[in-house]
Amino acid sequence: MTRVVHIIGAAFLLSSYAYCGLSRFNEHDIEGGDSYKRVKREFERLGSKWLGGTINYYYADNNNSVKEKVKSAIAYIANHTCIKFNEDPTHWQRLKIFTSELSHCRSTIGAPGTRSGSAGELSMETGWCANIGSIVHEFSHSLGRYHEHTRPDRDNSLKVTSTDYEARPRPWGMTTMYGPFEHGSIMMYHSSNYGVGKMEPYDMEYKNTMGSRRVTFYDMYKINQYYGCGCSTQLECKNGGYTSPSDCSRCNCPKGFFGKLCNERRQQDSYELKATYGRWQTQTISFNYKPEPVSDGFYSTFVYITGEANSTIEITMEGLENVICTAGCTWNGVEIKSREDSRITSPVMCCKDEPLYKKVFKSLHNPTIIELYSKETAPSTATFKYRFMNDKIVFG
């Protein structure tokens, strides 16, 4: 559990375009020790936040199909953060949103009228944004967030040999940390974005996870932390959730957990399986996209596998049908939530020729959750085996 939103700290960077555990570090966890206090103050002084946490915006054109995706992205962010959206073309601090197919998919970083520029208007282009998640990505830039792969600590997780200007890491003095590095973040590019072999994860199980456009739990958490979102009364949220600043009567829940306190299952597309000791059982689950009132453009089916107390749950994939193999697994895929922090994205698979396929995943989470996600309406299937053992494991 840690703290990271890549937010601006220097004017010469702020005007550039960008394309597409909930405890925090203490000051001694970051290089410089006591100097971190100074760095954080400097960041807050030079930062480029939307005042009052409100994005004032208007549309430059009228591509209705793209506007619907923009509206869905707005609804998703507003539902998970304290950020407000106000359609007002005359506000002194405003965002001009282009939806024409002639526009790109990019945004200036940070709010207008602050350190990102003296003008009261900046722009965001959405015409080429393929899905809702891509537009959430661009709004995140406007809210002040850099790409995940440019974090100053990225070299602990990525081997980047690209000399591309946009691939360079941001220095410590220009960021402040609000969460863990996440390969599956919506702000991460796929591994071949700068060329084959130019940006590889040290943990190669994450290669196809990079470039996802599913919004993660930590993606929204980091925005909440940067903007100081919170509630005067904290709920007793379960399973790593926290009181939602958009509605203080409920919790923001990690994926797979539902209800006011994150201690419930969803009533539909939810499967409970009980593992047996030492003996593999086989299960096939069908999954496909279904519309929801608030969505990042994907729909997930969840499988909950339980074993005896203090046991190790083991899972291995046996088959994937109608699952599209692509960088970032951006159409559909399978995530077995086996990593130590169950709120962070575990490695995602969508290809039969990758190392994850047929690997035996070992997890101490009881239950261990399998998330089967899709933005395709045609059904896909995943076949897997599961059991529990009593051996000890090291997370990973």
Swiss-Prot record:
EC number from the UniProt entry: 3.4.24.-
Query: What does the entry give for GO biological process?
Result: molting cycle, collagen and cuticulin-based cuticle; proteolysis
Q: Which UniProt keywords apply?
A: Disulfide bond, EGF-like domain, Glycoprotein, Hydrolase, Metal-binding, Metalloprotease, Protease, Secreted, Signal, Zinc, Zymogen
EC class of the enzyme, as a word: hydrolase
Active site feature = 138
Pfam families reported for this sequence:
Astacin (PF01400)
Glycosylated residues, per the record, are: 63, 79, 310
Q: Which InterPro entries match?
A: MetalloPept_cat_dom_sf, Metallopeptidase_nem, Peptidase_M12A, Peptidase_Metallo
One GO cellular-component annotation of the UniProt record comes to: extracellular region
Co-factor(s): Zn(2+)
The residues forming the signal peptide are 1-20
Citing just one GO molecular function, the answer is: metalloendopeptidase activity
- Protease is among the record's keywords: yes
Which SUPFAM superfamilies does the annotation name?
A: Metalloproteases ('zincins'), catalytic domain (SSF55486)
Taking every annotated instance into account, which residue ranges of this chain make up the domain EGF-like? 224-263
Superkingdom of the source species: Eukaryota
Q: Where does Zn(2+) bind?
A: 137, 141, 147
| Residues of the Peptidase M12A domain | 44-230
Disulphide bonds in the chain: 82-229, 105-129, 231-251, 253-262
Q: How is the cofactor bound?
A: Binds 1 zinc ion per subunit.
Q: Which residues cross the membrane?
A: none
Q: What does this protein do?
A: Metalloprotease.
Q: What is this protein called?
A: Zinc metalloproteinase nas-24
Lineage of producing organism? Eukaryota, Metazoa, Ecdysozoa, Nematoda, Chromadorea
